[in-house]
Amino acid sequence: MTLNSLPVWPALQAHYEEIRDAHLRDWFAPANDRAPTRAERFTFEGGGLAADFSKNRLTDATLALLVRLAREAGVEARRDAMFAGETVNPTEGRAALHTALRANAPDAPFQAQVAAERAKMARFADAVRSGAWTGYTGKRIRHVVNIGIGGSDLGPKMVVHALHHVATPDIATHFVSNVDGADLARVLERIDPEETLAIIVSKTFTTLETMTNARSLRDWFVANGCPEGALAKHFVGVSANPAEVVKFGIAEANVFEMWDWVGGRYSLWSAVGLSIMIAIGPERFDELLAGARDMDEHFRTAPLERNLPVLQGLVGIWYRNFFGAQSYLVAPYSEALHYLPSYLQQLEMESNGKSARIDGAFVDYPTSAVTWGEPGTNGQHAFFQMLHQGPTLVPIDFIAVLTPEHPLASHHPKLLANCFAQSEALMLGRTLDEARKIAGPAKPELAPHLTFPGNRPTTTLLVDALTPRTLGALIALYEHKVLVQAAVWNINPFDQWGVELGKILGKVVEADLTAAQVDPAKHDSSTSALIARARKALGE
């Protein structure tokens, strides 16, 4: 299947030509925006969240055509196959059953294994949180260091930061991912080996960055007085390769299992989320799962016309494949969601940044947009200038939490006002005539600089309060959005072959950086010159 061969495609192209120059300002004008208002028609709810799509460049006809696109592309069939545990990752011959990790239904796949592993996690988390699990000198654990990269880092770090307000104050959680030694060194400055628990997270337990950091941390423990025989009090491992964990030196009883039917970027619901469970406790971890389950149920059962992940995915395709948007921005007006944009970068671009279709042919249309973002209001003082007055179209997801999770309640109206005002300003803009009035007769030359084109599309997601449950629903919303877009683009969102070539060449380059001699013909002239400079700096 090619995207532009679907029966609905010519109708969508014609519709795009018809409305591409229409301005959102006119659609919201009182003469056109009669009951039910545009906001009422384009606001939908599901999984405890609300989404206002009304400030997007679409009409009722647009949505009808996009929903038809979803049906013709087989979105429903792909969704149902994923939930059923079918092989939806054909290049690796695997299912993608992250939804089974939160299913809580006896007929869902792998429920016995999932329940047993979660119970083991809960026992361990309770022991650490209560002080029953101690370090080698008998002191309780005060620091947890999660060592992992990609999905073994981004998801847990994002959730622990987001739910800080419900986390235990007795344990600080640190995350180390980068192979740059500075990342680990800065954490080592803040922790005490007698009070530190290390969680090493790697699906294969061979990941270069993770194992380099794990070995350095193990050496640090021993160098700072921990007997090698007591390391079991300070190291646990999470992996789909338990034998390799034991080979590293972690006690078999301290191994938590993940499975190859869960992709790394979808794995925070598994034992990969052990650092989350220690921080917020097993009961709140269950609430996180329940929120994701709420969105799973909404995704499975809501009509496509009112289905939040479906609509979010289709709106993204509308801008990517018709308006030619190269990127889209995620702007959470919540400091608690500081790491959500970086988490979504991996979720969206590692999943859908593909050029090969499932059938092996190459696409002739754009796939994943560049995903980026920063919390509000910080972003307003960095890149919103470009969003308002630059020539580039950047669709935006605003995320607003309506009630604060902190005691400084007087700040919150200011935060929400900025979020809502930005969406309004991006939609309305300011005409040249309006700008001339502001510039006045004394400075008419200023008017062009005071104009705003407006017509910049935004979606606003509303969360009543940031709780484990609503956070779980928000994360699952984006997970399912990715699947919807992958189905329409006919690509596999569950593999990541694009990360492999650099890894392979990285091992060759690393060997050349320390080798006695290097054959300059082994690499291109640029890479050879870079290696030569680095060897000189390293004293080789």
From Swiss-Prot:
Pathways involved: Carbohydrate biosynthesis; gluconeogenesis; Carbohydrate degradation; glycolysis; D-glyceraldehyde 3-phosphate and glycerone phosphate from D-glucose: step 2/4
Record's GO cellular component terms: cytosol
UniProt xrefs under Pfam families: PGI
Subcellular location, principal: cytoplasm
Highest taxon listed in the record's lineage: Bacteria
This protein's UniProt keywords: Cytoplasm, Gluconeogenesis, Glycolysis, Isomerase
Catalytic activity: alpha-D-glucose 6-phosphate = beta-D-fructose 6-phosphate
Enzyme class: isomerase
GO annotation, biological process: gluconeogenesis; glucose 6-phosphate metabolic process; glycolytic process
Subcellular location: Cytoplasm
Record's protein name: Glucose-6-phosphate isomerase
Organism for this UniProt entry: Burkholderia mallei (strain ATCC 23344)
Gene name as annotated: pgi
